[in-house]
UniProtKB/Swiss-Prot annotation:
Domain of life: Bacteria
Species for this entry: Cereibacter sphaeroides (strain ATCC 17023 / DSM 158 / JCM 6121 / CCUG 31486 / LMG 2827 / NBRC 12203 / NCIMB 8253 / ATH 2.4.1.)
Catalytic activity: N-terminal L-glutamyl-[protein] + L-leucyl-tRNA(Leu) = N-terminal L-leucyl-L-glutamyl-[protein] + tRNA(Leu) + H(+); N-terminal L-aspartyl-[protein] + L-leucyl-tRNA(Leu) = N-terminal L-leucyl-L-aspartyl-[protein] + tRNA(Leu) + H(+)
Annotated protein name in UniProt: Aspartate/glutamate leucyltransferase
NCBIfam families xrefs: PRK01305.1-1, PRK01305.1-3, PRK01305.1-4, PRK01305.2-3
InterPro entries tied to this protein: Acyl_CoA_acyltransferase, Asp_Glu_LeuTrfase, N-end_Aminoacyl_Trfase, N-end_Aminoacyl_Trfase_C, N-end_Aminoacyl_Trfase_N
Annotated GO MF terms: arginyl-tRNA--protein transferase activity; leucyl-tRNA--protein transferase activity
Gene: bpt
Function: Functions in the N-end rule pathway of protein degradation where it conjugates Leu from its aminoacyl-tRNA to the N-termini of proteins containing an N-terminal aspartate or glutamate.
Group of enzyme by EC: transferase
Protein family: Belongs to the R-transferase family. Bpt subfamily.
Any single Pfam family the record assigns to this protein: ATE_C
PANTHER family given in the database record: ARGININE-TRNA-PROTEIN TRANSFERASE 1 (PTHR21367), ARGINYL-TRNA--PROTEIN TRANSFERASE 1 (PTHR21367:SF1)
Database matches in HAMAP family: Bpt (MF_00689)
Amino acid sequence: MRHTLPIAPQFYVTAPQSCPYLEGRLERKLFTALQGEHAQKLNDTLSKQGFRRSQNVLYRPSCAECSACLSARIRVADFEPTRTQRRVMKRNADLRRNATSPWATEDQYALFRRYLDDRHADGGMADMDIFEFAAMIEETPIRSRVIEYSRPGDTPSNRPLSAVCLTDIFDDGLSMVYSFYDPDLAGRSLGAYVILDHIEIAREAGLPYVYLGYWVPGSRKMGYKATYSALEIYKGGRWQAIGQPSDHRAELHPLSVDPIAEQVARISLPEARSGDRSRD
């Protein structure tokens, strides 16, 4: 008979550093390695509990003074675009989508650099060189794709790259790990379009969710995520409709934080089948 054994990763906590979303706050992350034959199963399980992937690491914010970073996902079947979002889709109808293996290219990096220099020149990724960029794209132990969007050029074969998204494929959805786009095409609202197109990709694939990363009440950088209908957040150990964004201000209070040991104890882990067989 086959036995099931728990996949038991070790969890660690990062040292506090400045929060990129809320001024004057410190961030801290709970993380574990994502590797080995059970990486996909571990990723699928922990993503449902608010974890995100960065290369071969799974992490979840675990700050000492607040719990404002709430994992967010869109219910694909219930999503209804707003009038503005429909205009964004129409405006970008000429873009061509191309899903490729997670392999970095010089064109991608050139677009990435332009995006960072224009939008996040003082951010934590501002100094990434091409080798670090390649590692971000290529170091993935799970099913991942790079989704490229190109626009018409001077000739049919010349289609300039307009936007790129590194996307993970879960058993229940798509996770938008990182996206970037041409900063000179602000009128196209490419950031919004990439999200809308991922909803369509998930719909076509029969996947129920699109994971957007973290929504942070009180953060202007993350406020846009609340504009998408059928949005859920992971709060209090369960997924729930976001409701009114103002209802989640209490997550900024220090008393909203549980001790690290309690957080780890509540994490549900997947089981792995053992290859050993025994006779009754």
